[in-house]
Curated annotation (Swiss-Prot):
EC number(s) given by UniProt: 3.6.1.7
Domain of life where this protein originates: Bacteria
Species per Swiss-Prot/TrEMBL record: Granulibacter bethesdensis (strain ATCC BAA-1260 / CGDNIH1)
Keyword Hydrolase attributed: yes
Domain Acylphosphatase-like: 3-89
UniProt keywords, alphabetically: Hydrolase
Signal peptide: none
Molecular function terms, GO-annotated: acylphosphatase activity
PANTHER family registered for this protein in UniProt: ACYLPHOSPHATASE
Reactions that this protein is recorded to catalyse: an acyl phosphate + H2O = a carboxylate + phosphate + H(+)
Location of the active site: R18, N36
Protein name: Acylphosphatase
């Protein structure tokens, strides 16, 4: 089990990025959450099988077709994770 906190920068809001990420995470059997930030980035916590977590982070480098990802910051996370994947409001 692995958990990573990621911040995604670029043209990532208003392009369906959160819904895309949630759908991909659920398809991979991952848990966590995703939300927009007021600073224009998308933030996510992704947890599950390490290979699936890394696969999703690789996919996040491209994102949905309307997105343009400039940068992804990722850090290991050790907080307890609730099963399932949620899409939260902007913070």
């Amino acid at each position: 089990m692995s958990a990573k906190h990621v911040l995604i920068s670029g043209v990532v809001q208003g392009v369906g990025y959160r819904a895309w990420l949630r759908s991909r995470a659920e398809a991979l059997g991952l848990s966590g959450w995703v939300r927009n930030r007021l600073d224009g980035r998308v933030e996510a916590l992704i947890a599950g099988d390490i290979a699936a977590v890394e696969e999703l982070i690789r996919a996040c480098r491209t994102g949905p077709s309307a997105a343009r990802v400039d940068r992804i910051e990722e850090h290991l996370d050790t907080d307890p994770i609730t099963p399932g994947f949620e899409q939260y409001p902007t913070v």
